[in-house]
């Protein structure tokens, strides 16, 4: 037993140190914005963010003097139901957040693929800008939806990388939570 040599026993180990409370998602984005203005968009790699956290971050990004975009992936399948209004897509649409883009996917990072495509555009080059609608999302498996589910997401201004019967898949509709296409806000 080498635990004593490694000081890994109750009597030889370091005493516990009091920690600090974790910051909220909004506090994290506010700290990032205060530290650096050299970022244009953000997403969270935390699948456990509550809807309220997304609403708080979206409100911060919306109110920011610097133009930024917040991306959200909704994985809750209840968002596919037109009658369910407690998901992030429904709430953000209700608030008409023009600087927030939402996508539904079983992949919790699907919106990262969409933003990766959009944020790598060279606006100085000729014919280099893209329309986000109808694009492929590298690394994301397309969702097989019913017509009713697709209509529910569209009504919530929630994008989706959707599979079609002709063996293609596209990102639809390329809209923000507010009344605009992504391409009208980006850039």
Q: What label would you give each PLM region?
A:
Residues 1-187:
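Surface-exposed assembly/interface segments
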């Amino acid at each position: 037993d080498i635990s004593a040599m490694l000081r890994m026993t109750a009597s030889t180990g370091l005493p516990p140190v009091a920690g600090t409370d974790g910051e909220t998602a909004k506090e994290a984005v506010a700290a990032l914005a205060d530290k650096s203005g050299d970022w244009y968009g953000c997403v969270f790699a935390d699948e456990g963010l509550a809807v309220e956290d997304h609403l708080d971050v979206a409100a911060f990004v919306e109110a920011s003097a610097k133009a930024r975009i917040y991306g959200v992936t909704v994985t809750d399948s209840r968002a596919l139901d037109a009658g369910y209004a407690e998901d992030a897509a429904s709430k953000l649409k209700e608030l008409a957040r023009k600087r927030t883009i939402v996508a539904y996917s079983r992949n919790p990072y699907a919106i990262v693929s969409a933003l990766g495509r959009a944020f790598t555009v060279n606006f100085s080059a000729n014919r280099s800008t893209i329309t986000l609608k109808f694009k492929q999302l590298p690394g994301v498996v397309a969702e097989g939806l019913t017509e009713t589910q697709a209509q529910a997401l569209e009504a919530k201004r929630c994008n989706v990388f959707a599979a079609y019967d002709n063996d293609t898949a596209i990102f639809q509709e390329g809209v923000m939570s507010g009344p605009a296409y992504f391409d009208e806000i980006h850039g």
